[in-house]
From Swiss-Prot:
Tree of life domain: Bacteria
NCBIfam families attached to this UniProt entry: ileS
Chain residues that bind ATP: 652
Family, as annotated: Belongs to the class-I aminoacyl-tRNA synthetase family. IleS type 2 subfamily.
One Pfam family recorded for the sequence: Anticodon_1
Lineage: Bacteria, Bacillati, Actinomycetota, Actinomycetes, Bifidobacteriales
UniProt enzyme class: ligase
Stretch forming the signal peptide: none
Full protein name: Isoleucine--tRNA ligase
Species name: Bifidobacterium longum (strain NCC 2705)
Biological function: Catalyzes the attachment of isoleucine to tRNA(Ile). As IleRS can inadvertently accommodate and process structurally similar amino acids such as valine, to avoid such errors it has two additional distinct tRNA(Ile)-dependent editing activities. One activity is designated as 'pretransfer' editing and involves the hydrolysis of activated Val-AMP. The other activity is designated 'posttransfer' editing and involves deacylation of mischarged Val-tRNA(Ile).
Cofactor: Zn(2+)
Motif placement: 'HIGH' region: 65-75
Length: 1103
């Protein structure tokens, strides 16, 4: 325990004059400046040993941000969560290195460079030169590092920037190269041709996880749907009608699929332009085509989809039509233009017949499975090639209109098909649907067949699921919920990008297909061995980026002619591959620090927002499983999303959130930290950020904490005639002799320490905040309120108790409000830093015995239970006063307290009278109260609007049961269960309100009183009748309050005596005279004059 004593008032300085209402931003700047000068962060890291084999290290992985954009509230939130746990673990004696990292590669960096260069196409990049473009990328990626460092510093987040890693550094890139080679050697990296989400602007594919990370990837888009009727080959005037939302894909329609068990109909319109023709449609979807079919259409027959399987139709467009196209080895080959069955067909929309083209993943899988050869008619900019000459050069979405026009009129390329075989545009409609957009540039994506390198996630999926069970997820439902389900449905990961600024894919291939060869490299030394040197830039420096690594070319060893050469494929790795490699690449593993990596893997703790279950969390897990057969992390917090004040996504345009720097300047960082860390967002929910919410944090947390410190210093400095009281830590042998209020506070402090410790051990940061908030109420609104007189009387036990508690409390508060805790703790103790102090252990973690502090912070369950009941009585009674609009300064005659263990509460009769301003209190057991007609009635109110969507018609039965009393409270969940004709039905939070009401049989007494049930049982009844004496005393106490305000305005010391002159309305003079002695005593008035006047006036002069 600390040897420090307080005060240092006689030493001068801040502790002698603690401000009652400080500027928290100014205080924080002072603390930050002190930390910088003292090098406190580095000292906190160095003070704890690593231990043998680094066993005493707590390993934290910091997810790397991009530094080519300014930080925002999301970074702020995550940064605070990243700081809390390492601070706590450091105080527990663990060594916690906090190395910062930077994501520097990938399209975000390229797009920023393009913006700065004023270019927007790949052609322009290639024209200026890849080397110059990559130089621009390098310059842009660390553009805002200073802003980031200032921002992180201001939020009091301790990180090591000096030793931070960057994904563009050669050691990091070499480790990434090694990882790719390992995956390749294990058969987990392969090249494939698949349909992938593809960005036309960036000219590169995306991975499936990139479409699921953020909600705004999918945006509403208006398109035109078409239902195209294709002519059946084996039936006159019969057409199969397929449906698509992408008209531009119709020129490459190669097949149709139906549901084998779905009901279809062959219908013949009897009127309109389609009269006499027959159309195959899904039976359930006929209502969608009433206009086209007319009123009196004929159902020729009904059939299952399986009966359509194998039937053939004529192609819509002529580009891949004719005998040659339908022959072996050509597109689409002999199986093209055939109807097949598939299990993914439904009748939710469309026709029940699904168009198959090589621009959908399911489509491509079907075409491949049926032996249909397909082709890609788009170039890498998603413009039609010469394979579709009528639309050559048209961008895919721009081609929709001419394709529709040709389908509508049967002209253009359709005119080349004989009319008796020609397809018909059966229906076209405008259609609004949720459509994926590129998360980097917001361009609508298409699904396009591309050649890409993949990680075979599906091969290791069972192991991914197994290892996930070893991870502690916060909140816990993410493990088998969002993350577990994502793993269960994981697809192979596309890792190659047709771009420029990134880690190169270390694959070299022969330029002559006659002599095929593939070489994959896993280190710079392997490259040097084969190519004679490392990749070097124009200055001769080793550089693994394009174009320098592309310059490594050698003769193909498998070519006896010596003419073919080995060239690197042009693709670079997905930047997520690098992010997923940070666990080992930051150490340059396996080339250096092999033992260090093995001792720091997996991480003990990581934290990011919930979307990273499809991003960084997921890819760390994939890479760790594939390479090391271990999880990458042990504990992970997935927090929710920060929303603007209107509940929408934060937007600079909408200005729907308070400026971060403005919040720091007005309220301080600790207030923002607390606002975020105490919210449901750390339990996975979302959070609306408002200035009011942050201001409330200052009022409810920051100021009360400071006020308790100010109160202590005010009285401690004033004691002994201004010489000060040397408050110190209590000793264990003193505790038993302390007053009950002191022992209660010590017991509650012990419970605070244990609750916060348990919560932070479990990474439940918001639960720790809840424990602190509850304790602040105990400390400020209970202990200090009820012990002021003892401090006035310079009671040593009160000083030492409050000092002991505040010192321990600041150590608990240190991770959660680090700067306020620092300022208060240093002011109390004169110590170097609370962040260099030990956590206030009350129980030794190794032995389970009480520590020295634990023998002072002694728990006393009986005392705590009794005092909590007393506080409950006070809270309930004050609520009654507020409801009755009777101020606390107004005395009342009687309070009735009914409780189970009433004797325990009765022992605090005087305390209750003083706290509640009550003249008399009657105490009664529940049994005695019932005998006198007093009881608690339990009522259930069902919120039909909230419960209706879930319960449907059952909600009416729930309401009826609530009124008839056919319900009970489930003992385990605490939720009400109502009886319905279908059985018992449990209501969920938000669907109901439980009300406990006091019922009095005596109507006369009930009319003159108000009552309230207490949360843990029992109730209070407050007599609200007022007589002349009570009103007079109430007025006198209002006068006392006005005098105290005048003392404060005159800047008088708490011990200063005064001469008092009161101006009082004539009708109130008698009230003042009646309570003259009370007023003089409470205000320290040595002389007291009363004058008549129009309104109350107060004059105070130091006596």
């Amino acid at each position: 325990m600390s040897e420090n004593v307080y005060p240092k008032a006689n030493e001068g300085g801040e502790t002698a004059h603690v401000a009652p209402n400080p500027s928290f931003p100014d205080m924080e700047e002072t603390v930050l400046d002190y930390w910088d000068k003292d090098d406190t962060f580095q000292k906190s890291v160095e003070r704890n040993p690593s231990g043998d084999h680094s066993q005493n290290e707590f390993v934290f992985f910091d997810g790397p941000p991009f530094a080519n954009g300014l930080p925002h509230y999301g970074h702020l939130l995550t940064g605070y969560a990243k700081d809390v746990i390492p601070r706590y673990q450091t105080m527990k004696g663990r060594k916690v290195n906090r190395v910062f990292g930077w994501d520097t590669h990938g399209l975000p960096a390229e797009l920023e460079a393009q913006k700065e260069l004023g270019i927007d196409s790949v052609d322009q990049i290639e024209k200026m030169g890849i080397d110059k473009f990559n130089d621009a990328c390098r310059a842009s990626v660390l553009k805002y590092t200073n802003e980031w460092q200032n921002y992180v510093h201001r939020q009091a987040r301790w990180v090591d920037f000096e030793h931070g890693y960057k994904t563009l550094n050669i050691p990091y890139m070499e480790s990434v190269m090694w990882a790719f080679k390992q995956l390749y050697d294990k058969g987990l990296a392969y090249q494939g041709y698949r349909v992938l989400p593809y960005c036309p602007k960036d000219r590169t594919p995306l991975s499936a996880h990139e479409l699921r990370m953020d909600a705004d990837v999918y945006q509403d888009r208006q398109d035109t749907t078409v239902s195209v009727a294709v002519k059946m080959r084996d039936e006159d005037d019969a057409y199969a009608v397929f449906w698509t939302t992408t008209p531009w894909t119709v020129p490459t329609n190669f097949a149709i699929v139906v549901g084998g068990d779905i009901d279809y109909v062959e219908v013949r319109p009897t009127e309109g332009k389609f009269a006499g023709k027959k159309f195959y449609l899904g039976k359930d979807l006929l209502p969608h085509y009433e206009k086209e079919l007319g009123e009196n259409y004929e159902v020729v027959r009904e059939l299952k989809g399986s009966e359509l399987e194998g039937r053939r139709y004529y192609p819509v467009f002529p580009y891949f039509a004719g005998d040659e196209a339908e022959s072996e080895g050509h597109v689409p080959g002999p199986n093209g233009y055939t109807i097949f069955t598939a299990d993914y067909v439904d009748t939710v929309e469309g026709t029940g017949l699904v168009h198959q083209a090589p621009y959908g993943e399911d489509d491509m899988n079907t075409l491949n499975a049926k032996g249909i050869k397909s082709t890609d008619v788009l170039d890498d900019g998603c413009r039609f090639t010469a394979q579709c000459p009528d639309y050559e050069g048209d961008f895919v979405f721009d081609a929709n209109l001419p394709i529709l026009r040709n389908l509508r009129a049967g002209d253009g390329p359709l005119a080349e098909i004989p009319e008796e075989r020609r397809a018909i545009l059966f229906q076209e409609k405008s259609y609004v649907h949720s459509y994926p957009h590129c998360w980097r540039c917001a361009t609508p994506l298409i699904y396009k067949p591309v050649s890409s390198w993949f990680v075979s996630v599906t091969k290791i999926k069972p192991r991914l699921l197994e290892l996930n069970q070893q991870i502690n997820w916060i909140p816990g439902n993410v493990k088998d919920g969002q993350f577990g389900k994502w793993l269960a449905n994981a697809r192979d990961w596309s890792i190659s990008r047709n771009r420029f600024w990134g880690s190169p894919i270390p694959v070299w291939v022969s330029d002559d297909p006659k002599y095929p060869r593939v070489d994959v490299y896993g280190s710079l030394e392997e490259l040097k061995a084969d190519f004679g040197d490392y990749p070097r830039d124009k200055d001769g420096n080793i550089n693994m980026h394009r174009p320098w690594i592309d310059n490594l070319v050698r003769v193909n060893p498998d070519d006896p002619t010596g003419k073919s050469h080995m060239h690197r494929i042009s693709d670079v790795l997905d930047c997520w591959f690098e992010s997923g490699s940070m666990s080992f690449a930051q150490f340059h593993y396996p080339f250096e620090n092999k033992e260090k990596f093995e001792q720091h893997f997996p991480a003990d703790y990581i934290v990011e927002y919930i979307g990273q279950t499809r991003g960084w969390f997921y890819l760390l897990h994939v890479m760790a499983t594939a390479l090391f057969d271990r999880p990458a992390f042990k504990n992970v917090i997935c927090h929710g999303i920060v929303l603007g004040s209107d509940g929408q996504k934060m937007s600079k345009h909408l200005r729907n959130y308070p400026d971060v720097n403005g919040v720091f300047d007005k309220y301080g960082s600790d207030a923002m930290r607390w606002f975020l860390m105490s919210s449901p967002i750390l339990r996975g929910g979302n959070l609306i950020v408002t200035a009011d919410g942050i201001r409330d944090t200052v009022r409810q947390v920051m100021l009360p904490v400071w006020s308790s410190y100010y109160f202590f210093t005010l009285y401690a400095n004033a004691a002994n005639g201004g010489a000060g009281f040397d408050a110190r830590q209590l000793r264990a042998d003193e505790v038993a002799g302390l007053p009950e209020m002191d022992r209660y506070l010590l017991a509650r402090t012990r419970r605070l320490v244990l609750a916060a410790e348990k919560s932070l051990n479990e990474f439940a940061i918001s639960d720790a905040c809840d424990a602190v908030s509850d304790f602040i109420d105990v400390l400020t609104n209970w202990y200090i309120r009820n012990t002021r007189d003892r401090f006035w009387n310079e009671d040593a036990s009160a000083f030492n108790t409050l000092y002991t508690v505040l010192e321990a409390f600041m150590r608990v508060l240190a991770p959660l409000a680090p700067m306020e805790a620092e300022s208060v703790w240093r002011g109390l103790t004169g110590g170097e830093s609370v962040h260099l102090a030990e956590w206030p252990f009350v129980v030794d973690e190794k032995t389970g015995a009480d520590t020295e502090l634990g023998r002072v912070l002694v728990d006393d369950p009986a005392l705590v239970d009794a005092m909590e009941k007393v506080r409950e009585v006070v809270s309930g009674t004050l609520s009654l006063r507020k409801a009755a609009k009777i101020r606390v300064r107004q005395p009342l005659s009687k309070l009735t307290v009914v409780a189970g263990n009433v004797e325990a509460v009765k022992a605090y009769d005087d305390l209750l009278k003083a706290e509640l301003n009550i003249k008399n209190i009657e105490f009664s057991t529940l049994q005695d109260a019932a005998a006198h007609g007093l009881k608690i009635v339990h009522e259930l109110r069902v919120n039909a609007r909230a419960a209706g969507p879930r319960l449907g018609k059952q909600v009416q039965f729930a309401i009826k049961a609530s009124k008839s009393g056919d319900w009970h409270v489930d003992a385990a969940s605490g939720a009400p269960v109502v009886s319905t004709p279908s059985g018992d039905l449990a209501l969920v939070e938000g669907e109901y309100e439980l009300i406990n009401r006091v019922e009095e049989e005596n109507a006369t007494e009930a009319a003159a009183s108000v009552s309230a049930a207490l949360p843990t049982g029992g109730f209070v009844i407050l007599d609200t009748a007022l007589d002349a004496d009570l009103l007079a005393e109430g007025y006198a106490r209002d006068v006392i309050r006005s005098v105290q305000d005048a003392r404060k305005a005159a800047d008088l010391d708490i011990a200063d005596r005064i001469s008092l002159v009161l101006t009082v309305p004539a009708v109130d003079v008698a009230k003042v005279e009646q309570f003259r002695d009370l007023i003089a005593h409470e205000t320290l008035a040595t002389s007291f004059e009363v004058k008549e006047g129009a309104e109350l006036g107060v004059e105070v002069v130091k006596a």
